[in-house]
């Protein structure tokens, strides 16, 4: 009985409807493939961004060291003009 029901449904579907259903399935398949491609691209981008962030974090300690150096130099220049600051040769003789 089930087979006769599907045969009856097939007879009720016109050729135009069959063509529409086939084309709809093709378009849905293309959309699915495109979405998968986009998802793969986004995953690759995510991996690249995570790698870049990891490299940046590796330089954080170096950045902190340079910041400390520049902050120290800035505090020295605020205390005395450059002409009055001792040079290495002057500090060795003291």
UniProtKB/Swiss-Prot annotation:
GO cellular component: cytoplasm; DASH complex; mitotic spindle; mitotic spindle pole body; spindle microtubule
Phosphoserine modification, residue list: 91
Any one GO biological process: mitotic sister chromatid biorientation
Entries under Pfam families matching the protein: DASH_Dad1
Entry keyword set: Cell cycle, Cell division, Centromere, Chromosome, Chromosome partition, Cytoplasm, Cytoskeleton, Kinetochore, Microtubule, Mitosis, Nucleus, Phosphoprotein
Major localization class: nucleus
Subcellular localization(s) per the UniProt record: Nucleus; Cytoplasm, Cytoskeleton, Spindle; Chromosome, Centromere, Kinetochore
Family (UniProt): Belongs to the DASH complex DAD1 family.
Function, as annotated: Component of the DASH complex that connects microtubules with kinetochores and couples microtubule depolymerisation to chromosome movement; it is involved in retrieving kinetochores to the spindle poles before their re-orientation on the spindle in early mitosis and allows microtubule depolymerization to pull chromosomes apart and resist detachment during anaphase.
Misc remark: Present with 799 molecules/cell in log phase SD medium.
Subunit structure: Component of the DASH complex consisting of ASK1, DAD1, DAD2, DAD3, DAD4, DAM1, DUO1, HSK3, SPC19 and SPC34, with a stoichiometry of one copy of each subunit per complex. Multiple DASH complexes oligomerize to form a ring that encircles spindle microtubules and organizes the rod-like NDC80 complexes of the outer kinetochore. DASH complex oligomerization strengthens microtubule attachments. On cytoplasmic microtubules, DASH complexes appear to form patches instead of rings.
This protein's name: DASH complex subunit DAD1
Gene: DAD1
